[in-house]
Amino acid sequence: MAMSSGGSGGGVPEQEDSVLFRRGTGQSDDSDIWDDTALIKAYDKAVASFKHALKNGDICETSGKPKTTPKRKPAKKNKSQKKNTAAPLKQWKVGDKCSAIWSEDGCIYPATIASVDFKRETCVVVYTGYGNREEQNLSDLLSPISEVANNIEQNAQENENESQVSTDESENSRSPGSKSDNIKSKSAPWNSFLPPPPPMPGPRLGPGKPGLKFNGPPPPPPPPPPHLLSCWMPPFPSGPPIIPPPPPICPDSLDDADALGSMLISWYMSGYHTGYYMGFRQNQKEGRCSHSLN
């Protein structure tokens, strides 16, 4: 009995000595592990030194810019000015097709160079289809109107394609079923919605003919811009040209832009046909007077 009790009593101290760590029995001195004060100070010091260096660098760059930029710009301008002044003298000659600005209305018309004065850098142009002559500066002459029109059409086509892609994407997200109808309505040219201009008078009553008192080449006015039409005119996929419809009756569905567009279009069409009728009657009267004198 004494040996068994002694053996059991001697085994307990061996088990207690084999325990290395027991949680919760004491306070561990590991609070310094989460102390990042030194790290924060080092970060703040690095950021402050970087900002200081960056500030000094900006001051040096801005102070050096004004010294270099003024020297480069005059050289580019002089080159472009030399090209512009030398091009008209070498480009234009008698018989060339060009476009010139009529001094009375400021519009561009196709013309042909009749004579050139290289000393004065001027020329005399004859407006195609009218016979009017006018002196122009060689530097003011423009490319033939066909080339200008082609460039304008290409730019307009590119802009229309870009706007069509953007509108198609937005409309597809709203109403996928109406995609074919929208494409058909957009493919039609915008100027087909306007009534066609009145036919020009016959060869006996045209402007620029002998016996008539037309001072300049008054062509029919161009149609209104497409953005003005789009704000008030509903799209028509097909059909013959029609008269612009009146504005809607309901005032709630009509905003200021739509009302202004409708008013301007009505004024434009009224003045267009009124001016044509008055000019046509004047041509008839002057034509009769010239025939009676002959």
UniProtKB/Swiss-Prot annotation:
Ranges of Low complexity composition bias in the record: 156-166
Domain Tudor: 91-151
In-chain residues carrying the UniProt-annotated modification Phosphothreonine: 25, 69, 85
GO cellular component labels: axon; Cajal body; cytoplasm; cytoplasmic ribonucleoprotein granule; cytosol; Gemini of Cajal bodies; neuron projection; nucleoplasm
Start-end of Basic residues biased regions: 68-82
Compositionally biased residues, Pro residues: 194-204
Highest taxon above the source species: Eukaryota
Residues annotated with Phosphoserine modification: 4-5, 8, 28, 31, 187
PTM annotation (N-acetylalanine): residues: 2
Main location: nucleus
Family, per entry: Belongs to the SMN family.
Amino acid composition bias (Gly residues), ranges on this chain: 1-12
Classification lineage: Eukaryota, Metazoa, Chordata, Craniata, Vertebrata
UniProt keyword terms in alphabetical order: Acetylation, Cell projection, Cytoplasm, Isopeptide bond, mRNA processing, mRNA splicing, Neurogenesis, Nucleus, Phosphoprotein, RNA-binding, Ubl conjugation
Protein name (Swiss-Prot/TrEMBL): Survival motor neuron protein
Protein encoded by which gene: SMN1
Position of the Glycyl lysine isopeptide (Lys-Gly) (interchain with G-Cter in SUMO2) cross-link: 51, 209
InterPro entries assigned to the protein according to its UniProt record, in alphabetical order: Smn1, SMN_C, SMN_G2-BD, SMN_Tudor, Tudor, Tudor_SMN_eumet
PROSITE patterns: TUDOR (PS50304)
Region (P2 (binding site for SM B)): 240-267
Region (Disordered): 1-32, 58-88, 156-222
GO molecular function, one term: RNA binding
